[in-house]
């Protein structure tokens, strides 16, 4: 019978490997000019590099501090990406205000309560609610479009993957902070990596949607979306 440790090692290696794939697809398909796809690929590349730290022999204190810093940055980074990828001026404004605000709150909270995982209990819970709300918000806005272009479908797949990942984080968060002792750290990480194995193939399929090119903005679009002139929302045929 295969032990849990072996299963964990296999799952973690596969998950970390998948984190590199979106960036490889962006480079192979020359999607660098497609801003949302590039930013999400960069995000998962950062996740891949961040998860490699697990294979380093760090002291428990150093690993705890690293986990705190990672949790402080993760959701603000994702919200910042949404501020560039969304076509809604309201979502753009909201995420551009909330992302730095959450980071500032996390820093102040850690300065007061200490740089340890326990100090992020309530801040992290609030961040998870906000990022899940923004993801659902964006999915609803995309589905309201009369015609779903290929790139919009690609972004919907990415959003669905993110929603699943952060939904799993909520479960881990509840067990970690409110049901201590119910599961081990290894169990939580195993669930985390398993969620990545499910979510990342969905997200990666979004990068393979046909017709991803930076679209020229029509005069009508420029009038209707004056706030989105500087950075293209998404890419289409």
Give the location of each predicted region.
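Terminal, non-globular segments
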Residues: 1-237
């Amino acid at each position: 019978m295969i032990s849990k440790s072996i299963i964990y090692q296999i799952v973690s290696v596969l998950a970390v490997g998948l984190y590199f794939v979106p960036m490889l697809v962006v480079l192979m398909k020359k999607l660098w000019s497609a801003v949302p796809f590039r930013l999400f690929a960069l995000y998962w590349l950062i996740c891949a590099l961040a998860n490699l730290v697990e294979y380093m022999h760090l002291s428990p204190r150093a690993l705890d501090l690293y986990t705190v810093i990672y949790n402080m940055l993760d959701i603000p980074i994702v919200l910042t990406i949404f501020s560039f990828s969304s076509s809604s001026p309201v979502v753009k404004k909201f995420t551009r205000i909330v992302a730095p605000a959450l980071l500032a709150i996390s820093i102040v909270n850690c300065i007061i309560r200490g740089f340890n995982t326990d100090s992020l209990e309530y801040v992290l819970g609030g961040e998870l609610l906000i990022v899940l709300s923004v993801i659902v918000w964006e999915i609803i806005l995309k589905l309201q479009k009369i015609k779903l272009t290929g790139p919009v479908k690609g972004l919907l797949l990415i959003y669905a993957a993110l929603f699943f990942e952060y939904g799993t984080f909520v479960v881990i968060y509840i067990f970690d902070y409110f049901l201590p002792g119910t599961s081990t750290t290894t169990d939580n990480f195993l669930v985390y990596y398993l969620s990545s194995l499910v979510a990342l193939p969905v997200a990666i399929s979004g990068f393979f949607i046909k017709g991803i090119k930076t679209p020229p903005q029509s005069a009508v679009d420029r009038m209707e979306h004056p706030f989105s002139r500087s950075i293209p929302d998404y890419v289409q045929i």
